[in-house]
Structure formats: structure tokens, C-alpha cells
């Protein structure tokens, strides 16, 4: 994806990038075997501080995943929603998380997913200066060559609440989905909570 956006490298037909955030143990126990059975790859955005803790993958499991179809990248150090915490913590969350994960993996960590997608221009600057090549949000949409490398959209699929029709709509109607989500957030931010909750968001 980076080579496509930065250098114009041709993509395969019907390209898709599959990502998983946080690093829960089911990524190792359930997702990895499924990916292997279909000869597919994915990226796991790992919370550095969660490695070797309850409900999350271990360092050894990350190494196995990295060797069998998963690219391991960063989801910050402690999974703090960056725009809601003291800016003095941003470097530790972004660069500190990268450094810690590189220590576990023994390889460069190039990409970041912001927790909750929350970011701003200063966070993007720190991300770039920390050595990341791209960073991802949860703003719904498909990636285009004109996109900001440090605020790339994704299509969120959540466990248990995404039936096939919703999944299909998110894939094929991303601009409309993005508009409805943004409208929902605007209504909620301006006190129209009930109306926001009534919106069909797919």
C-alpha cells in the first residue's frame, strides 16, 4: 500500500488490506489459522504494553504470526485516546510504543493505527518524526493516492454486529457511510443525542 501511495506501484486486482487492532489472543488462536487456510495475509496493530498480558498475544506468538502471514505494526504504547490525554504523553505513546515493539520483534516498525482513530496535525507530525511511514484512522473510506499518509481511512468491521448486508455496504458505499458517520458525530457533538442514535449507520 505504501509503495502504491508513494511511488505509484501497481496494485493487484481487487486489492484489500486486512487489519486487526489491539492484539487480542483470538487473533492468534482463530484468525491466523483462517488466514493460513486461504493463503492470505493481514496486519496486526499491537498495543506494546499489552504484550504478554492476559487476553493478549505473547511475544512468542507475535513472532509466530509475523512468520506466517501477519505483519506486526504499532497501536501505540498504552492505547490512550491521544486527543483526550495530555500532549506531553504523545511522544511516549507514539515513539515509545514503536521502540518497545521493535525491541520485541527485532525489526523496524513502519506503520501506526491511532487508538480510536483520534489524531490531529501535531500528532501526525510526531508520528512522522518518530519514523512511521503511514498511520491509520477509523474514518470510514477507501484509500486514494491523494490521501494524507498520516490519516488514512479504514472500514471498521466489529465482532458480532456486522451482518453480510452491512459488510457489503461498507465495502461498496464507503463515501456514503463516511457521510452518515460524520453527520451522526456532528449531531451528537451539538446535543442532538437522540437523533444521532436513531441514524442508520450500517
Kindly give the residue locations of the regions a language model identified.
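Active-site beta->alpha N-cap acidic-glycine motif
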Residues: 1-68
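Short, flexible active-site-adjacent loop segments at beta-strand->alpha-helix junctions, enriched
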Residues: 48-50, 76-78, 156
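Generic alpha-helical hydrophobic packing signal
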Residues: 63-68, 75, 90-91, 126-129
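Short beta-strand and adjacent tight-turn residues that come in two discontinuous sequence segments
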Residues: 45, 75, 135-137
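Glycine-enriched alpha-helix->loop->beta-strand junction motifs that scaffold or abut catalytic
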Residues: 38-41, 68-72, 128-135
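Histidine-centered catalytic micro-motifs
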Residues: 20, 71-79
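C-terminal active-site subregion of NodB/CE4 polysaccharide deacetylases
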Residues: 1-19, 25-28, 80, 84-202
